[in-house]
């Protein structure tokens, strides 16, 4: 019985390790895509969204509603 569990563990562990080494480029691309999407949906105040005469504060603040210009 112990031998069965040992073989099961080795087979699962080796497939997990091999799967991780094969999928590294795919995971790297997915992580980069997530980072790009986060930058595109940046919640901080953007100067180009402010109406004329108003500006973003010097300290970056996250905007929940609207462009948050002062």
UniProtKB/Swiss-Prot annotation:
Q: Has keyword Flavoprotein?
A: no
Q: What is the lineage of its organism?
A: Eukaryota, Metazoa, Ecdysozoa, Arthropoda, Myriapoda
Q: What is this protein called?
A: Kappa-scoloptoxin(07)-Ssm2b
Chain residues in the propeptide? 20-39
Alphabetically, the GO molecular function entries are: potassium channel regulator activity; toxin activity
Q: Which UniProt keywords apply?
A: Cleavage on pair of basic residues, Disulfide bond, Ion channel impairing toxin, Neurotoxin, Potassium channel impairing toxin, Secreted, Signal, Toxin, Voltage-gated potassium channel impairing toxin
Q: Where does the protein principally reside? A: secreted
* Entry's localization field: Secreted
Q: Which family does it belong to?
A: Belongs to the scoloptoxin-07 family.
This chain's function reads:
Inhibits voltage-gated potassium channels.
Q: What range does the record give for the signal peptide?
A: 1-19
Hey, what tissues is this thing expressed in?
Expressed by the venom gland.
GO CC, one annotated term: extracellular region
